[in-house]
C-alpha cells in the first residue's frame, strides 16, 4: 500500500470518518519504528525459518563488533564457517534457551566466544561499552512465513535474532476481528513447534494486538497457551480512583500506540531483556526442564520503571548510578 494512502487512512480514523485497514495498521507501526526508534525494516525474504534469524543481520553484527573472533572462526572452520557457526548457535539456544544465550553469548571451539548482544553500559563515560551497545540493531519484518502456509504479521529482531512476534487485528475494518481473534490464531492456527514460536528457543514474547488492547504470551502451547493483558489500565474518575481493565481512550490516535511509541523503543526492549524476562523453575521439582518463561505485565514494567526513576532522583546518588538508569516511564 502506498504511504500516502495509509497515512490518509490513519488521519481519517482519528476523525472517526472511516476504518483503518490491517495493512495500514502494520505500515503505521513499521513507519514509526523506523523513523522514530531507529529500526531497520527488513524484507521477509531475509528470514531463515530454520534458525528463526535474519542471518545476514546477525553476521553483520559479528563482523562489526567481533572481527578478530570471526577471523579465527573462519580459519578454524575453513570454508564451512558460516554454517558451522549457525549450527553451534542453534544448538546453544536449543540447550540453554534464547535469553541465556543473549545474556552470556555462545562458546565455540578453541575457547572462542561470540556475544549475540551487547548490554546497555553501566555508565556513559565507558566509551568502549557505549560504542558496542550502539552497534546493536533492532529491526522489523512484516508478513513473515515461519513455516509454509503460516505467516506472522510482524516480527521484531535484535541483531537478527527474533525476539517478539505480533499478530494484528483491526476491529474497525470490515472483518470486525479484534485481539481475541489474534489469540485464537496463535492457539489454533500457528504451529508452536517451529523455531520462531517454540518456548525458550523462539521469540521471548508473542503479542495479540488490535486498536484498543494488547495481550501477551511468553510460552505458546497450542490450545493451552496463556495470554495475559498487556494493557495500561484505565483509572476511573471519582474518589475511589480504581483502575479497570483495558486502555485509556486516545482522542487523537490509537489506544495501543504505547506499544510502538514506548514498549518497542531500544531502551525499553533492553530493559525487558535484562531486567524482566527470565525462566522460573518449578518450586516442587527445581529442575531446568520444568522452567517456565516469565514476561512482565505492562503495569509491572511501568511500576518498576517509576520506582527506578524515583531512586535516580534521590539525593546523594552518584552520577554513575544515575547514568545507568535510562529507561523513562510512559
Protein language model annotation of sequence segments:
Residues 1-330:
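ATP-dependent helicase/translocase motor core
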Amino acid at each position: 500500500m502506498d504511504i500516502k494512502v495509509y497515512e490518509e487512512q490513519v488521519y481519517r480514523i482519528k476523525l472517526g470518518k472511516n476504518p483503518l485497514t490491517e495493512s495500514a495498521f502494520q505500515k503505521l507501526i513499521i513507519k514509526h519504528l523506523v523513523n522514530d526508534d531507529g529500526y531497520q525494516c527488513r524484507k521477509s525474504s531475509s528470514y531463515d525459518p530454520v534458525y528463526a534469524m535474519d542471518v545476514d543481520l546477525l553476521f553483520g553484527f559479528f563482523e562489526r563488533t567481533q572481527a578478530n573472533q570471526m577471523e579465527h572462526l573462519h580459519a578454524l572452520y575453513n570454508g564451512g564457517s558460516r554454517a558451522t557457526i549457525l549450527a553451534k548457535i542453534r544448538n546453544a539456544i536449543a540447550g540453554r534457551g534464547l535469553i541465556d544465550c543473549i545474556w552470556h553469548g555462545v562458546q565455540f571451539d578453541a575457547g572462542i566466544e561470540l556475544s549475540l548482544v551487547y548490554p546497555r553500559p553501566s555508565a556513559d563515560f565507558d566509551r568502549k561499552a557505549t560504542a558496542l551497545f550502539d552497534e546493536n540493531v533492532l529491526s522489523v519484518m512484516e508478513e513473515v512465513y515461519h513455516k509454509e502456509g503460516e505467516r506472522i504479521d510482524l516480527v521484531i529482531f535484535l541483531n537478527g535474532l527474533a525476539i517478539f512476534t505480533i499478530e494484528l487485528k483491526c476491529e474497525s475494518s470490515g472483518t470486525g476481528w479484534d485481539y481475541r481473534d489474534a489469540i485464537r490464531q496463535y492457539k489454533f492456527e500457528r504451529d508452536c513447534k517451529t523455531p520462531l514460536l517454540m518456548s525458550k528457543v523462539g521469540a521471548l514474547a508473542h503479542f495479540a494486538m488490535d486498536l484498543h488492547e494488547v495481550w501477551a504470551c511468553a510460552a505458546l502451547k497450542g490450545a493451552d497457551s496463556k495470554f495475559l493483558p498487556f494493557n495500561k489500565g484505565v483509572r476511573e474518575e471519582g474518589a475511589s480512583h480504581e483502575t479497570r481493565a483495558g486502555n485509556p481512550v486516545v482522542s487523537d490516535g490509537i489506544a495501543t500506540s504505547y506499544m510502538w511509541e514506548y514498549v518497542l523503543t531500544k531502551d525499553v526492549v533492553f530493559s525487558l531483556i535484562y531486567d524482566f524476562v527470565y525462566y522460573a523453575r518449578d518450586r516442587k521439582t527445581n529442575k531446568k526442564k520444568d522452567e517456565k518463561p516469565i514476561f512482565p505485565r505492562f503495569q509491572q514494567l511501568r511500576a518498576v520503571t517509576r520506582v527506578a526513576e524515583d531512586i535516580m532522583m534521590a539525593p546523594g546518588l552518584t552520577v554513575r548510578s544515575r547514568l545507568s538508569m535510562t529507561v523513562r516511564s510512559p
